Amino acid sequence: MGRAVCLCSGGLDSTVAATIARRSGMDVYLIHVSYGQQAERREIEAIERIADAIGASDLMCSRIDLFRNISALTTQGARIPRGEEVSLDSESTPPTWVYCRNTVLLSMAAAYAEYLGAHSIYVGFNAEEAMSYPDNRPEFVEQFNALLEKAVASFSRPPKVVAPLVDMRKKDIVRLGADIKAPLELTWSCYLNGEIHCGTCESCQHRRRGFVEAGIPDPTEYQH
């Protein structure tokens, strides 16, 4: 089936996407990028366990400083909206938005894919987060794939971004992950760097609601 690069944060969505690629018979090459996110340590711990669990062929952990201190998400000690400050179904862009993050990270994944001769780049973009994050939307994927047609060497077959969850809400992703035996219990969703999920940041609230609405027991330990 060939090779697939999977851009994976160690979170729920990207782990399910990577598991889909692996279950389809592809050799999976995970790439994680540290860009200054407060939860960097916990993400790396999660992605290392996930790589082993799904049988990834390799895990590349990369680092860039471009995004440091330009978002609440990437400023150490910055206040991240929590609890009732979070509106899960809002269409407004939250302070955790990181400017052009997915454009940059996908470019890195595309370079890795071209080097490997991988024809697919799997991502965990989904309908729930697309409401407030424009670089999670189907039209973004479509336009980025059009860019890749022009961006690779003439002798290369352009890799294509594959977003298998792009029309799904979190509850659907949880159900699918359970069905394909993705290691959901190993994933890290929290924006913070604690020993357990805080339970109150936007990402924790999406995660918790997804398990509740899916009717599947949540393996996550939350602080609140």
Swiss-Prot record:
CDD domains: QueC-like. Binds 1 zinc ion per subunit. Zn(2+) binds at residues 190, 198, 201, 204. Its EC number is 6.3.4.20. GO terms for molecular function: ATP binding; ligase activity, forming carbon-nitrogen bonds; zinc ion binding. Pfam families: QueC (PF06508). Its cofactor is Zn(2+). ATP binds at residues 8-18. Coiled coil: none annotated. It catalyses: 7-carboxy-7-deazaguanine + NH4(+) + ATP = 7-cyano-7-deazaguanine + ADP + phosphate + H2O + H(+). InterPro entries: QueC, Rossmann-like_a/b/a_fold. Pathway: Purine metabolism; 7-cyano-7-deazaguanine biosynthesis. Keywords: ATP-binding, Ligase, Metal-binding, Nucleotide-binding, Zinc. It is an enzyme of class 6 (ligase). Belongs to the QueC family. HAMAP family: QueC. Catalyzes the ATP-dependent conversion of 7-carboxy-7-deazaguanine (CDG) to 7-cyano-7-deazaguanine (preQ(0)). NCBIfam families: 7-cyano-7-deazaguanine synthase QueC (TIGR00364). This is 7-cyano-7-deazaguanine synthase. It comes from Methanothrix thermoacetophila (strain DSM 6194 / JCM 14653 / NBRC 101360 / PT).
